[in-house]
Amino acid sequence: MFDVSIDTGSVPSNVDILFTDRKGGFSLPPYESFNLATHVGDDLNAVQKNRDQLTSKLPNRPIWLNQVHGHEVFDADDWDGCSIPTADAAVTTRANQVLAIMTADCLPILLTSNCGSVIGAVHAGWRGLASGVIEKTIQAMQSKIITKHTKQTIRAYFGAAIGPKSFEVGEEVRTIFVEHDPQVSKLFIPSQRAGKYMADIYGLARNRLNAMGIHEIDGGQDCTYKNMNFFSYRRDQVTGRMASLIWIKASI
């Protein structure tokens, strides 16, 4: 059920992260089998069984977001326990508050301070990246770090996303990113089709993280489009969603 290439050895001892793939669930084709999304047309009973199976491995049920490819960041310290916030990122300092991001080609990014006092989760498609969802999430985390009067760094973990040899975009997408930072032009390789480019979403995210002073980044080797163990919207159109989750462990 969990098939992402990252080294979890650098995760703070008081933080847990978890990535799902498409295996080991109850959903039938074309959502087979561990689909966690309720908005893609899958049988809701199957989705609930999948969510229940996932929750059994967690300290609490996750905070599912209504993701809209924007840059809003939800402060999960204020979660009421039942609402579905409309946002594309979340942060928290609360133990056992499970942050979750759903994806099927977009890049999920999990973030933690080096001592695990503040965590974040980001849904980073190209629209969210371009509108500053990474920067806004880091700023939200830093505001919580400052209130604790301690110097901390932030590290990032990439879940599975579409790879640079599979993610074709148009000139308009390239222009948006290059106008923001001309150095990222190297992350757009001309495609065989005129006016199209193969984009490196991992590289674009690294660029934004580096600009925010974050250089401890793990993951980025997986391709959802090429690896059939992952859901891929671009490959299959009608398909499920995977989850990337992070939480602070409660003190014993």
Language-model regions: role of each:
Residues 1-252:
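Active-site microenvironment for binding and transforming phosphate-containing groups
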